[in-house]
């Protein structure tokens, strides 16, 4: 089996939850119009919907309004995605910076253990990833498959981010259950079983 197919299998196994974040956003004429289309929603459900949509779409005005109203910055949806994870994944650096400034938890994990940093690395959001690397999180924080942000950076060839993670204290020799390390991955070695 060639290297590409091994890499493709590992990539699929390790990134499936991150790709789920890119599901299409349902655009409505306005937030109010979406409420009228779903009147059975409680006020809390509506606010949650506004919060997550604003994070995905980069709507800083709605984010600021809800922050000012003391909305729970770390509230997560049914998949464990926080507004910070969604904003990082969708490339909204102004929203990421505002959420961090307001006190959002940069170390929050979704239901698969992935963080906003892992999503930013996956999507090549370098500026956002650098911001999140500087946050007060364990540099080697693994997801529930034992994979770290450094492994993602190595897998996707994000050399600049891999160096930044190493400078922040990431152990490039920390292994996942298959024996993969960021160092090995960056050298083209990838174990799939």
Regions found by a protein language model. Name each.
Residues 62, 94-95, 127-128, 160-161, ...:
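Conserved ankyrin/ankyrin-like repeat signature
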Residues 154, 159-193:
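Leucine-rich solenoid repeat scaffolds
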């Amino acid at each position: 089996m060639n290297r590409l197919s091994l890499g493709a299998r590992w990539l699929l196994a390790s990134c499936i939850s991150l790709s789920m974040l890119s599901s299409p956003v349902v655009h409505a004429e306005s937030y109010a119009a979406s409420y009228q289309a779903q009147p059975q929603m409680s006020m809390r459900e509506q606010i949650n919907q506004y919060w997550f949509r604003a994070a995905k779409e980069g709507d800083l005005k709605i984010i600021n309004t809800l922050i000012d109203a003391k909305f729970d910055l770390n509230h997560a949806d049914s998949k464990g995605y926080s507004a910070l994870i969604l904003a990082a994944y969708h490339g909204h650096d102004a929203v990421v910076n505002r959420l961090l400034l307001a006190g959002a938890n940069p170390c929050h994990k979704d239901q698969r253990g992935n963080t906003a940093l892992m999503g930013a690395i996956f999507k090549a959001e370098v500026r956002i990833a650098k911001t999140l690397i500087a946050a007060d999180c364990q540099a080697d924080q693994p997801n529930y498959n034992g994979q770290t942000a450094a492994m993602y950076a190595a897998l996707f060839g994000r050399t600049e981010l891999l160096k930044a993670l190493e400078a922040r204290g990431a152990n490039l020799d920390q292994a996942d259950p298959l024996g993969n390390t960021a160092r090995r991955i960056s050298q083209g070695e990838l174990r799939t079983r």
